[in-house]
Amino acid sequence: MTWPVKDFNYSDPVNDNDILYLRIPQNKLITTPVKAFMITQNIWVIPERFSSDTNPSLSKPPRPTSKYQSYYDPSYLSTDEQKDTFLKGIIKLFKRINERDIGKKLINYLVVGSPFMGDSSTPEDTFDFTRHTTNIAVEKFENGSWKVTNIITPSVLIFGPLPNILDYTASLTLQGQQSNPSFEGFGTLSILKVAPEFLLTFSDVTSNQSSAVLGKSIFCMDPVIALMHELTHSLHQLYGINIPSDKRIRPQVSEGFFSQDGPNVQFEELYTFGGLDVEIIPQIERSQLREKALGHYKDIAKRLNNINKTIPSSWISNIDKYKKIFSEKYNFDKDNTGNFVVNIDKFNSLYSDLTNVMSEVVYSSQYNVKNRTHYFSRHYLPVFANILDDNIYTIRDGFNLTNKGFNIENSGQNIERNPALQKLSSESVVDLFTKVCLRLTKNSRDDSTCIKVKNNRLPYVADKDSISQEIFENKIITDETNVQNYSDKFSLDESILDGQVPINPEIVDPLLPNVNMEPLNLPGEEIVFYDDITKYVDYLNSYYYLESQKLSNNVENITLTTSVEEALGYSNKIYTFLPSLAEKVNKGVQAGLFLNWANEVVEDFTTNIMKKDTLDKISDVSVIIPYIGPALNIGNSALRGNFNQAFATAGVAFLLEGFPEFTIPALGVFTFYSSIQEREKIIKTIENCLEQRVKRWKDSYQWMVSNWLSRITTQFNHINYQMYDSLSYQADAIKAKIDLEYKKYSGSDKENIKSQVENLKNSLDVKISEAMNNINKFIRECSVTYLFKNMLPKVIDELNKFDLRTKTELINLIDSHNIILVGEVDRLKAKVNESFENTMPFNIFSYTNNSLLKDIINEYFNSINDSKILSLQNKKNALVDTSGYNAEVRVGDNVQLNTIYTNDFKLSSSGDKIIVNLNNNILYSAIYENSSVSFWIKISKDLTNSHNEYTIINSIEQNSGWKLCIRNGNIEWILQDVNRKYKSLIFDYSESLSHTGYTNKWFFVTITNNIMGYMKLYINGELKQSQKIEDLDEVKLDKTIVFGIDENIDENQMLWIRDFNIFSKELSNEDINIVYEGQILRNVIKDYWGNPLKFDTEYYIINDNYIDRYIAPESNVLVLVQYPDRSKLYTGNPITIKSVSDKNPYSRILNGDNIILHMLYNSRKYMIIRDTDTIYATQGGECSQNCVYALKLQSNLGNYGIGIFSIKNIVSKNKYCSQIFSSFRENTMLLADIYKPWRFSFKNAYTPVAVTNYETKLLSTSSFWKFISRDPGWVE
């Protein structure tokens, strides 16, 4: 529904409808009622300034009152004309909000989000209509005084700005109560303070891309985004999910490190900004906030069911109306008794909308405007714009007017390109400064060496102690310990298109009868002043270096110097880190050749700033920018001065001024009640512990990502900002010198070359933009490298210690209860050992769906791709090398391509050969000294069980090189030198009885070689074996690689290989996992072998937790039956998967697809359905929150809801599984928990069931199902 936005003039008279006089006691500036305009339902605009200070003043204060930049103008909104402009400006912005679907939905949420009539102190059976958190008094001037005549219950009041015009806020109206309804689900009305004509500015310095035409620059925020940001705070307040102020990130402030003395950054702000910065809040805390909100909403639903009274009692006739209003607001359902209840799916959708979808990052993408990349982005001098002028700002385009070409690169927001964006007077701006002073001797301090740095020019680095430490606490595990799983990933399109917000909501009349509210006497707030900070340093740091590069005002004789000290001592000298530039600039114009001189100067500068270096010792980054060191004097005293050498020696941590060494505290231990004596409770405790172990790994990874985003990336981004400043200062000096020389130039061509001179100066900005792209790439690679190389190994090391302790405790628990657990001891120990066999991979995309972070990681991944010297891919049904080196690839006639996956090939008979001849241009050192080989392989059972040795990949000539062999279920990598001395790596991949092996399954093999160290063998990203190879003699590598099975005579002996790559670098463990994640195709559901699961194909189905049993019908109910022969996988009743949406026959099944399962039974097909009758966990029990349903067969193959399932991919190192969900009557359940005979009435078999409390089962292996297809590689 689109709510119309009404037009008003400030001079319009009060009308007892949508123009009223309201008394706002929170505003200490105005003690009389103020004129208010309802521009759309429940949203009022009051064109007045606002202050809650005890002694309010709009004048510029003597000292900063904000740690951010402040701007003061006491005359703003002092006239009716200005108030009219403000009113119409807000109206125009609301009309612009209504231009997009996301904006319409925002307004809709605000309109129907009236705060609850009451709070936690209100009796649970009562609506209280006298609360100041919901009501505003309406007054009229009668008989010489103001009198209250009515009330209104608005959602939002929009005032003009605070004394600091740049301080946009959305505050609450509280009555001195101890609790806060905005935190407790009830909600409160919201008061906004905004100034839409005054615009914050930011730079795109840290963005991934910028135009080579317009270059990087300073941009202003679109006022519609600034307003929507504050309205999102209002949403959180109205819906009672506002986050308390103690949930925040504190800045790290220390004597020896330069970071912002900034305010605490509230979680509320990070949610409202959205995007990448939300990931700073650890997942565990985000889940807790959601659970808290869910609990509050359940309490409110309970209240609604009990309410039968009102305050005042005369309003009792309104009970049903307000019950309807609040049930629509919270999206409650009614159960079969007519009571209001929370629908979990609807709650999740609403909560996701309010906390994820409604955010500044999403708004800016939907309105196609330029916006700051991070919440911590640096702000610059604000600007002013007349947004009422359609020649400047329109409802459709904002500042980026198409008719002026301002839509290109958002140049309408570019303060250098759009003359309508007027810079504010710096005299009215107040900044907080850090005074930096050079300590001349140990005890000597000289103020003449001090410089002043704006607080917002320092990086914001979070205090690590302000990031949740809960994962480091000890935890007691019982049979009742649950894992709460909630994903805050969201689909924007689904959110915009869904119909969750009521289409025709119940609406209250704007003007309501007076309810005689108690007077609200709120005390004013005391103004807090901040003082500048002084810090002493022992050397000229980056702030001194930047200061030395600034151009002084009114200097007539500019010279460049390569001495920082000299530049700091003389106003006419500018420091440059480019000696050749200083020489050319200082030489000046010779023999009247002005244009030649100017061209030489510009060319020297632009050539130097585009330089990049590569160092063989650095494998972490593709290039380095050598002049960053002399531009900013980065690094410690031992390494300062030689940036390249320092970087090669110390790595990326060398760039971090503060806290370069990442540390992780010891993880808390899991403990168990040793007194447990019930068999089922012990088993359940073990299962819960394994689930909690997985959660501990995920929480630890999330904690690491939070630290990286809030403590590391902010420091790296700060280098970007400083380098942009540095290059801009250099360009300013060059421009000023060109202007001075041009002013003195008296040549006859002076006027003719004027435009060329201007073009030269403009070209500096373009080249700075290109240089910044290189710098950004370098800095981003450094940041990601720090995550993967400095942080991840330490986290995994601590997790491995935690695993060792936990596994030991679990085995001890089983051993100490072996009598009670008779018959289950071996199975439980095997399950524990298997669970702890592999570490959980770190896939950063599991912790964020932010597009910017994905771009950064993909860029890092591309640097891995850049090192490929062979990459076999299928193009137009031919196997070719796509590495760029164009190796010759010859495929034998009998080789089958693209048999299972796009880039695979099948080898069977001895005549099947693929011969690859590498490009001769590949350097010897590049292919061997640091090299890696990776590929996916699938080896048939008969080839595995053979006792012969088969060479399957061979690159040995004249007794030297490498090869890959198979023998007795082992895969062996052999590296051999010219003297036939060799080293080998061996991995046993053969099938075990517990189905944990790799026979005939796809698995990922990586071998890395380093001639000065080790060669290593990885399987699915896990290091399995390493061997020193530095004692080998010379290894001559053949440029020919032959794929084939030597001496093969059995037609059932075959193998498949896909995605074969050779890299000219030693891939790290993190690199390998990135390649693995990029090739595993998680969106494609896999069968037991790792092949794509397909529709209209027969499968045998087994449960991962009960691999010794197959699924079969018994009395029309599905049960698990013991295998008569565990080596026979093709046992039982085959299942065919059918598509609900008529997908192409035999097409791949994707993650989340809806499916129907048909089972062949007694030569007839049946549909598997979920029974509609509940099986109770204890016979005769009641179905409450833990309903259990059996699976059964139905002869009718129609498309019925109880037979529709959705499927989700589960991939775990050496097994491919799926989870299956049942959707029926809006009650989503997971097929999980094999219910054992003693647990309910089915006495003779283990039975698969559907359970409603599926959130606690998502990590349980009893919910993992495997589909076994008849495969040529497994012949029975």
UniProtKB/Swiss-Prot annotation:
Record's keyword annotation contains Cell membrane: no
Effect of residue 1240 to A: Significantly decreased binding of heavy chain to synaptosomes, whole toxin is dramatically less neurotoxic. Significant decrease in HC binding to GD1b, GT1b, GD2 and synaptic vesicles, GBL is well ordered in crystal
Residues where Zn(2+) binds: 229, 233, 269
The keyword Secreted appears for this protein: yes
Effect noted on mutating residue 1242 to S: Significantly decreased binding of heavy chain to synaptosomes, whole toxin is dramatically less neurotoxic
Known outcome of mutating residue 457 to T: In strain: D-SA
Applications: Cargo proteins fused to the N-terminus of whole toxin are imported into neurons; stabilized cargo proteins are poorer substrates, suggesting partial unfolding of the cargo protein is necessary for import. Can be used for targeted secretion inhibition in eukaryotic cells. A construct with a mammalian growth hormone-releasing factor ligand domain (GHRH) inserted between the LC and TD, when injected into rats, leads to decreased growth hormone production. The GHRH ligand domain binds to the GHRH receptor on somatotrophs where it is taken up into endosomes. There the TD inserts into the membrane, releasing LC which cleaves synaptobrevin and inhibits growth hormone exocytosis.
GO biological process, one term: proteolysis
Protein family (similarity comment): Belongs to the peptidase M27 family.
Additional record remark: There are seven antigenically distinct forms of botulinum neurotoxin: Types A, B, C, D, E, F, and G; new subtypes are quite frequent. Types C and D can undergo domain swapping to create hybrid types. Botulism poisoning is usually food-borne, either by ingesting toxin or bacterial-contaminated food, or less frequently by inhalation poisoning. In both cases the neurotoxin binds to the apical surface of epithelial cells in the gut or airway. Toxin undergoes receptor-mediated endocytosis (using a different receptor than on target nerve cells), transcytosis across the epithelial cells and release into the general circulation. Once in the general circulation it binds to its target cells.
Name of the protein: Botulinum neurotoxin type D
Organism: Clostridium botulinum D phage
